[in-house]
Amino acid sequence: LRHNIGYCSTGSYKGYIIIPSYDGEGNLNYYVGRSYYKSDFPHKNPTASKNVIGFDMLIDWEEDINICEGAFDAFGIGENTIPIFGKFMPKKLKAKLIEKRPSRVNVILDRDATEAALDVSQHLLDNNIDAYLVQVPEGTDPGDLGVDKMKELIDYAEPLNLMKIMEMKFEL
């Protein structure tokens, strides 16, 4: 019930699980569709702008924030996790992070998005927000690993600095 997940039995989303996202006032700001059955098209997303703060209504901005790619990744990470519905941080999220200034932001993108994760981290550091790059093992994602393993990876993540980001970008 927390995420208000639904299922479509008719229409263009027939056979898809629908995961809605709500803004801070409780208004629908985005949704993702995921096929319940094996499909050539497992994801079906709207053509709407992704310049939203995913699951904003569920975020406690006074606590540490987790940023990840998708809704199912967010479920695998647990509380206070914002899916960015892709690899790039939306402008609205950038602005809200600067406004709210959380004490720690854990950046948790898939391994194939390491460069994007470093860019997100650099933006946070440029705005004096502590960034931690949480790297999931190759070939997995947070949704595969689950909350307990993700908590362990988050707990062991070290804070980034600009020098470390540059070193990591050079190694890509």
Q: What feature does the model see in each segment?
A:
Residues L1-I18, Y22-E25, I59-D60, A95, ...:
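TOPRIM metal-binding catalytic domain and adjacent DNA-binding surface shared by DnaG-type primases
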Residues I67, S103-A116, Q135:
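Acidic beta-strand-to-loop metal/phosphate-binding motif
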Residues A116-N128:
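Short, aromatic/basic amphipathic alpha-helical patches
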Residues A131-D141:
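A generic structural motif
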Residues I82, N128-I129:
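Short phosphate-binding/catalytic loops that engage adenosine nucleotides
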Residues I98-P102, D141-Y156:
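Short, surface-exposed amphipathic charged segments that create phosphate/polyanion-binding patches used
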Residues F88-P90, L109-L118, D141:
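Acidic, metal-coordinating catalytic cores used for nucleic-acid/nucleotide bond scission
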